[in-house]
UniProtKB/Swiss-Prot annotation:
Record GO biological process: co-translational protein modification; translation
Protein's UniProt keywords contain Iron: yes
Protein name stated in the entry: Peptide deformylase
Function of the molecule: Removes the formyl group from the N-terminal Met of newly synthesized proteins. Requires at least a dipeptide for an efficient rate of reaction. N-terminal L-methionine is a prerequisite for activity but the enzyme has broad specificity at other positions.
Xref: InterPro entries: Peptide_deformylase, Peptide_deformylase_sf
């Protein structure tokens, strides 16, 4: 296993939809292991393959069901898609490993149903609410070429983009 570099905004790959995975092979299993190590090292709740520079529709996540419960353990979703949404909620103080040092309130669905396959190719259907629903929406957004800053007000988004541009210019 190896720690992978996390790609950060404004890297172009983060703005492009990911390719669907057709075969689960040894390389993909290695990628899952490396992404897992990277997720826990970061630390984060979820990590999409695109966030480590890999153009594949896959994500890993580990979310406790609520504040009082332990981790549910690592889960892998390949080619996930949201097939049902319900209700509205604001994800307060949402952040992202690919958008460092910035947090914002983000409009999300309160409940989602997600379908995909696991790392063994078995079909998976997840009915999620609360934090899990937010994490799944956030990570699936990555696979569709969207960042959470694409879902906030244009004023807040432009302030962040200016700050990043200024920092990049200062780095030379």
């Amino acid at each position: 296993m190896a720690l992978l570099d996390i790609v950060t905004y404004p890297a172009p790959i983060l703005g492009k939809p990911c390719k669907l995975i057709e075969d689960i092979d040894e390389d993909l299993v290695c990628l899952v292991e490396d992404m897992t190590e990277t997720l826990y090292d970061a630390p984060g709740l979820g990590l999409a393959a695109v966030q480590v520079g890999v153009d594949k529709a896959m994500l890993v996540y580990d979310v406790a069901e609520d504040e009082n419960s332990e981790s549910t353990g690592l889960k892998v979703l390949i080619n996930p898609k949201i097939v049902h949404t319900e209700g509205k909620v604001t994800s307060e103080n949402e952040g992202c490993l690919s958008v460092p040092e910035f947090r914002a309130d983000v409009p999300r669905f309160a409940c989602v149903t997600v379908e995909g396959v696991d790392h063994e190719g078995k079909p998976v259907k997840i009915d999620a609410e609360g934090l899990l629903a937010i994490v799944l929406q956030h990570e699936i957004d990555h696979l569709e070429g969207k960042l959470f800053i694409d879902r906030i007000s244009s004023l807040k988004r432009s302030m962040y983009k200016r700050r990043v541009a200024k920092a990049l210019k200062a780095e030379g």
